[in-house]
Amino acid sequence: FDEKNYHLLMKLYQENDRPGKVIETYYKLVNLLDKELGISPNKAIQQLYHEVMAKDRSDRKIKQFLRNTDHFFGRVGEIKRLESYFSKIIERQEPRALLLVGGTGIGKRTVTRQVLANQTKYFQIVMAECFKEEMTVGLQPWRSLLDGLGDLVIQHQILSTSQWQVILDSYFPMMAGEASDLELNTDRLARFVLDILQKISKKKALVILVEDCHWMDEASVAVLEQVMNHLRDYPVAFVLTKHLSTPPYLGHFFNRLLLRSQLDCIELQPLDFKTSAAYLQAQTGQLAISEERLAAIYRVSQGIPFFLSEYAEQLLRGEKFQPLTSVIKAKLSLKLGYLSSQEEELVDYLACFSSPASVALLAKLLGLSVEEVVEIA
């Protein structure tokens, strides 16, 4: 059997951006060779197949990630600043970080996706989301980032699939070791990531997106800082989203970037009344909402898009207005997982007030002294 013709056909499909036909042709060959000769396709064909699969995987991840919302209002100034940041990366061919800061439900993720959806022509995108539960697992965000980087490495023929897997296996099985081992691996990992980012960004500019970076473990921040310290003359955009709180080691990292003029910062503010009203009206369609109801919803939501969306759903279902819906409560519970039981109870009570509640009243509701409430707050 001459595999050359199959290889040429697969190459043609690859060049014409038809991944489905590449995969179909590959498996036809696999089945034929296995049935007739009991062998597998040659290494060149296998590598081409893995390249196409890696690109397809990467494209599907990005498409899923960048799904646009149908309800997007305001943030014109923030969007312009984000677009200016990405333009700067392309024009100067220099790495730079951007920090998008805001409270729960303020729209950090929505704004980021809205802008990145218009940048895919110029940038490749790799992302990771950080979780509080994984802060004790060393370098977990880098596992996610390397998963995406691996697809690009294979797609661009920088390394073969087997070579990439061998390198990954040399880092992550050892993460449960002693602190000294972790420190050594952090240094090695930073050098490896630096090399990979340089090679990938030579092909096309790159975005490294880290969501909820306030949950990044200290070792992951150390790797990120080492990479940014040594990355020069490559178009790599480091975009990080963060809650209002910041662990000290992450704060120190941002301060050092600021001193080197390598960090842009955008803090998202709640929507104003006019924009909030337009947002609600867009989500509820032709449903009539009185000025009084709009004012009440705005007072409780404080212009936070996530809350506005929940209250719009209530209106559409014709339900009685409830400031603390089950979805809002679940989101707050996940985002504020570090709260004690008393702090959670205080949040529940505060959510029921449309205006500030007195400390004395809260103390009475909680069955605590005024001093204890002040300490909790």
Language model regions located:
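Key residue(s) within conserved catalytic/signature motifs
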Residues: 3-7, 16-19, 23-27, 57-377
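Short coil/turn linkers that connect adjacent helices within long alpha-helical scaffolds
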Residues: 35-39
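Amphipathic alpha-helical segments of tetratricopeptide repeats
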Residues: 30-31
